């Protein structure tokens, strides 16, 4: 528990102290957000707001994670480091995307194929890595089984698992990216998801098969350290939300959204809760589904289901205030997280 508290506290402090000078530097070099012409007209006032604020989240999280290990005088684990590497790697892809947007003064950065290639390169390294490095109990950071609340079904071939993991990584990182359209929306939703993973990691530690071979135990390699990773990211996101709350003084950009999406899916794979992520990140799923429905409907029928996709912009065009949308969407995400935690606990109880 000391490591969890230390990670969150250090990350929060580092990110909070870093953000004001980062905002000033980004303003000075005119690293501001480019707004799409076809977006909601109210967003025109956000033109030039500093972006790439995800740098502070990433830096704070990394310092918080390794700082917590310094405080507790314990070495980082393979599972924790792999999730951090996925987090930083996808953040680098997002940074390139943001930098191109700023350099070329346009709302679109990396071409979709180039962004996908970057996600695949980082994702393949993570997916292969989690199938390696068994501990003395033969537990690896990840499992080639499918998982919902724990592993189930027969193991997949490693190559098939890599494809499955890539699908999860690309889908989740892009889902968080789509959600990052209103001040504070993606940050708040991610905070709620990270709280879930702090709880899951801590619970799996207490019910680990390493400590007691009981029917309801978990075969997760490094549950405590995964909770530390989640806590470090949680601290960074809370600090960022202070400056990202409406009206935002800084945006996380793709630097932050791709990184946080990668972190969430990395935690899902290593805690053996791959499919539960659909509930823990329920808001991200809803918003992504709205884009799929909108594009599919327009291509098939020539008609749009929503006034605009992603879903948050549909409600903007209906006249909802931005803060109203954000708070109501946070409530929806909170209900998803509560449902996921209930499922997680109820599955454990009967065993």
UniProtKB/Swiss-Prot annotation:
First-tier enzyme category under EC: transferase
Cofactor(s) required, per the database record: Mg(2+)
Catalytically driven reaction(s): UDP-N-acetyl-alpha-D-muramoyl-L-alanyl-gamma-D-glutamyl-meso-2,6-diaminopimeloyl-D-alanyl-D-alanine + di-trans,octa-cis-undecaprenyl phosphate = di-trans,octa-cis-undecaprenyl diphospho-N-acetyl-alpha-D-muramoyl-L-alanyl-D-glutamyl-meso-2,6-diaminopimeloyl-D-alanyl-D-alanine + UMP
UniProt keyword Cell wall biogenesis/degradation present: yes
Record-listed E.C. numbers: 2.7.8.13
GO molecular function, one term: metal ion binding
Similarity-based family: Belongs to the glycosyltransferase 4 family. MraY subfamily.
Protein's UniProt name: Phospho-N-acetylmuramoyl-pentapeptide-transferase
Lineage per the UniProt record: Bacteria, Bacillati, Actinomycetota, Actinomycetes, Streptosporangiales
Gene: mraY
């Amino acid at each position: 528990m000391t490591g969890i508290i230390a990670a969150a506290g250090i990350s929060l402090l580092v990110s909070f102290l870093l953000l004001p000078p980062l905002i000033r530097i980004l303003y000075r070099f005119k690293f501001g957000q480019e707004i799409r012409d076809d977006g909601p007209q109210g967003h025109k006032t956000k033109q030039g707001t500093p972006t790439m604020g995800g740098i502070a989240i990433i830096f704070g999280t990394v310092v918080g994670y390794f700082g917590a290990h310094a405080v507790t005088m314990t070495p980082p684990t393979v599972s924790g480091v792999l999730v951090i590497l996925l987090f930083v790697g996808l953040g680098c892809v997002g940074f390139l995307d943001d930098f191109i947007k700023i350099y070329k003064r346009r709302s679109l950065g990396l071409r979709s194929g180039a962004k996908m290639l970057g996600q695949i390169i980082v994702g393949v390294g993570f997916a292969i890595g989690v199938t390696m490095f068994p501990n003395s109990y033969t537990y690896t950071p990840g499992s080639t089984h499918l998982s919902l609340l724990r592993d189930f079904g027969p193991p997949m071939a490693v190559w098939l698992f890599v494809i499955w993991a890539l699908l999860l990584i690309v889908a989740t990182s892009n889902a968080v990216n789509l959600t990052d359209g209103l001040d504070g929306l993606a940050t708040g939703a991610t905070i709620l998801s990270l709280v879930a993973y702090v709880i899951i990691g801590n619970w799996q530690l207490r019910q680990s098969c390493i400590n007691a071979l009981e029917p309801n135990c978990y075969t997760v390699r490094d549950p405590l350290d995964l909770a530390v990773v989640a806590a470090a990211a949680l601290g960074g996101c809370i600090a960022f939300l202070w400056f990202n709350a409406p009206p935002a003084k800084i945006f996380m950009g793709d630097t932050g959204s791709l990184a946080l999406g990668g972190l969430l899916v990395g935690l899902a794979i290593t805690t053996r809760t791959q499919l539960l992520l659909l509930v823990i990140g329920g808001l991200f799923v809803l918003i992504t589904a709205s884009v799929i429905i909108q594009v599919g409907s327009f291509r098939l029928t020539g008609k749009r289901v929503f006034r605009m996709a992603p879903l948050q912009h549909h409600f903007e065009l209906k006249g909802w205030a931005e803060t109203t949308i954000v708070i109501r969407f946070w409530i929806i995400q909170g209900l998803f997280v509560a449902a996921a935690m209930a499922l997680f606990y109820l599955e454990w109880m009967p065993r």
